[in-house]
Swiss-Prot record:
The keyword Signal applies. The active site is at S298 (nucleophile). This is Neutral ceramidase B. Residues 1-20 form the signal peptide. Belongs to the neutral ceramidase family. It is found in: Secreted. GO terms for cellular component: extracellular region; membrane. It catalyses: an N-acylsphing-4-enine + H2O = sphing-4-enine + a fatty acid. It comes from Dictyostelium discoideum. One of its GO terms (molecular function) is N-acylsphingosine amidohydrolase activity. Its EC number is 3.5.1.23. One of its GO terms (biological process) is long-chain fatty acid biosynthetic process. Glycans are attached at N224, N252, N358, N378, N391, N421, N422, N577, N610, N614. PANTHER family: CERAMIDASE, NEUTRAL CERAMIDASE.
Length: 718
């Protein structure tokens, strides 16, 4: 075990010099809401509840999860991240819960611990691993450190239990809220196409799929969005769930602020339009924009270009042989990542609202679910799922060379390129890979044509990636949620949906099969057998080898058949418990300091006296390290409006889009907190102030924290 930790430390050191970054900026707009009611039938189809809770982790000094860029360390909050939970109960008392979280993914240990906490509250039979479905939106702008597996904790310097607990507790509290708010309800659904919002970032790999299969579809990405409208017995909507495939990478790897990215922004827009100002993350209306098969799907709709404006190489996504020079830009002006987030999130919101208002297909039928754990390192893949290969099996986990190349959403560094099938590789990186774990001849054959860079499944005594996968299907009437533990590419998702639909259609009329992406654990990417052959990023990150998709189709097919037959499925092997086998190398906050003659909360640079709309208010405070207290269900800032004699009303906080909370460590060792507010055009004229709240650790020999607050001088918005 010690040798494994030494190897991890050495790899961390190498990774810290591996990746590079770039720069980009902001704007904002408002989107009008035009809601209407759809008349419900007289009888309730279900009992449904919805809940929302804060899961925002450390906003300072912790690496952000997603791009694996060690230089992308958190330094504040743009807007908070939430868990949105929906409990469904049918007339027979069968229940299931779907949770969409503003997190990069759901890790195995998160799902297991959430179920443990729920069973502590409700007993062993209400919420189980079988009827709890947890899904991440895949934002790349949330704090990392919440996985116990080494590969996903390298750039975060290990497992940060405080982040892990924040996410788990937030999910549980969202479910508790949903559980307590269950009421007679009806659900309606509608599906439509959303364009100008996603593109395929690996068309070279997609094009390797069979011509007759590609001819079945109008695009190389899924354009369908499906929306679930949930309303009470008076026809008043209180929740919505949308499913649409697009990466949450509108915010690029130069961003250092916590953000829900485009899907989080879409949720924020809808909830705020319905619930009103000053209600970010508070409900009662809850809107989730769930993830789907986004593996090769980018929101950066301008596509990849070289920095000089010339096109990137189609096969390798390089410029003059270097992948660092090939970037995809979003639709914002000059590629502005904040504006791009608004546009892509706004597009999803607008389409979802349109479908929501026109939803006419009533959802009815029982709540059902099946769940199995499957050891995925040696699954025998049988026809028709074996791609015509005899004795097809999955492999122990491995990452290919193109994994290190990154994608056009966030390129890697050095001499790695996509579509690299060169098994001789680079002697230096071969040495590094062999140092971690040297691939065996059987492993090389099994993973072929992938040239193995990191043999993560062969590391002893504990693999660097999970190898026991949760396979889960949840049905709510004709809605079939296929909970996939990873990132399915466009064509992989289509094949899985089609295969499940064909089976489950024997017992469910006109089933609407939806991929719930990045659910219950994370196992990297799932490319088709054909896409795997060209080894772009998605194929190189298909952990269990070329037959990974076939094995998932086979195992999900077993669950679908079980639902048709009304039978149970085996629980499967118990996944590893890595508690006590993790390390975290980021030092704790020892003590906070403030300049001489100043105290925590004192203003360093005050606001101006007068502002107009579209201007940015800025105030700098001396503060404490935000890692002291994450301010869950609270805020590091408030924008307050004077509404009466000495009466202040908070109109914005750090859960809002128009504000930014920024942290910086001063050279002399104290924290500088900058609060920014971009004044929206519809802002009420009046007298305002900026407030900053936090906790300081004044004594290095005590764990006690001291709350503090700072207030700017008053200013006028005209």
């Amino acid at each position: 075990m010690i040798n494994s930790f030494k190897k991890l430390i050495i790899l961390i050191s190498l990774v810290i010099i591996l990746l590079s970054s770039n720069n980009i900026f902001i704007d904002s707009f408002k989107i009008p809401v035009n809601q209407k009611n759809v008349k419900s039938s007289g009888d309730s189809s279900y009992q449904i509840g919805a809940g929302i809770y804060d899961i925002t982790g450390a906003s300072a000094e912790v690496n952000l999860m997603g791009y694996a860029n060690p230089l992308q360390v958190g330094a504040g909050i743009h807007f908070r991240q939430r868990a949105r939970a929906f409990v469904f109960v049918d007339s027979n008392g069968n229940r299931a819960v779907y949770v969409s979280t503003d997190s990069c993914m759901i890790f195995q240990e998160v799902k297991i611990h959430v179920v443990e906490l729920l069973q502590d509250i409700f007993g062993p039979n209400v919420y189980t691993e079988a009827n709890v479905l947890l899904s991440g939106t895949h934002t790349h702008s949330g704090p990392a450190g919440f996985s116990q597996y080494a590969l996903y904790g390298i750039t975060s310097l290990g497992f940060y239990k405080k982040n892990f607990d924040t996410i788990c507790n937030g999910i549980v509290q969202a479910i508790v809220k949903a559980h307590k708010s269950v009421q007679p309800a009806n659900m309606f659904t509608e599906t439509g196409e959303l364009w100008n919002t996603n593109i395929n970032r690996s068309p070279f790999a997609y094009d390797n799929n069979p011509e007759e299969e590609k001819a079945m579809y109008d695009s190389n990405v899924d354009k369908n969005m499906t929306v679930l409208r949930i309303e009470d017995m008076n026809g008043n909507p209180f929740a919505a769930i949308s499913f649409f495939a697009v990466h949450c990478t509108s915010m690029n790897n130069t961003n250092h602020l916590i953000s829900g990215d485009n899907k989080g922004y879409a949720s924020y827009l809808w909830e705020k339009q319905v619930n009103g100002p000053g209600t970010a993350g508070k409900g009662p209306f809850v809107a989730a924009f769930g993830q789907s098969n986004e593996g090769d799907v980018s929101p950066n709709t301008r596509g990849p270009t070289c920095r000089d404006g010339s096109p990137c190489d189609y096969k390798t996504s390089t410029c003059n042989g270097r992948n660092e020079e090939c970037w995809s830009l979003g639709p914002g002006k000059d590629g502005d990542m904040f504006e791009s987030t608004q546009i892509i999130g706004g597009n999803q919101f607008n389409k979802a609202l349109e479908l929501f208002n026109n939803a006419s297909i009533q959802v009815s039928g029982p709540v059902q679910y099946r769940h199995s754990w499957v050891q995925f390192t040696n699954v025998s893949v049988e026809p028709p799922y074996n791609s015509g290969v005899d004795n097809a099996t999955t492999c122990r986990g491995a990452m290919g060379y193109s994994f290190a190349a990154g994608t056009t959403d966030g390129p890697g560094a050095f001499n790695f390129v996509q579509s690299d099938n060169n098994t001789s590789g680079n002697p230096f990186w071969n040495f590094i890979g062999d140092f971690i774990a040297k691939p065996t001849p059987d492993q090389i054959r099994c993973q072929s044509p992938k040239p193995i860079l990191l043999d993560v499944g062969m590391v002893e005594p504990i693999p660097w990636v999970p190898d026991v996968m949760p396979i889960q299907i949840v049905t709510i009437g004709q809605i079939v949620l296929v909970a996939v533990p990873g990132e399915f590419t466009t064509m992989s998702g289509r094949r899985l949906r089609n295969s499940v639909r064909e089976i489950i259609g024997e017992s469910i009329e006109n089933p609407i099969v939806l991929i719930a992406g990045l659910s219950n654990t994370y196992s990297g990417y799932i490319a088709t057998f054909e896409e795997y052959q060209v080894q772009r990023y998605e194929g190189a990150s298909t952990v269990f080898g070329p037959h990974t998709l076939g094995s998932y189709m086979q195992e999900f097919g077993k669950l679908a058949q079980s639902i048709v037959d009304g039978t149970t499925v085996p629980a499967g092997p118990t996944p590893r418990n890595l508690t006590g086998h993790t390390l975290f190398f980021l030092p704790p906050v020892i003590v906070d300091a403030a300049p001489d003659f100043d105290d925590f909360g004192e203003v360093s640079i005050d606001v101006n006296l007068n502002y107009s709309v579209n201007e940015t208010v800025s105030c700098v405070f001396y503060g404490g390290n935000p890692r002291n207290d994450f301010m869950i269900e609270s805020s590091f800032l408030s924008v307050d409006l004077l509404t009466g004699t000495d009466q202040w009303t908070t109109v914005l906080d750090d859960g809002d889009w128009d504000t930014k909370f920024k942290w910086k460590m001063h050279d002399l060792g104290f924290s500088l907190i900058t609060i920014e507010w971009v004044i929206a055009p519809d802002t009420t004229p009046g007298t305002y102030r900026i407030t900053h709240s936090g906790f300081a650790k004044k004594n290095p020999f005590s764990s006690n924290l001291t709350p503090y607050q700072g207030i700017s001088r008053n200013f006028v918005v005209q």
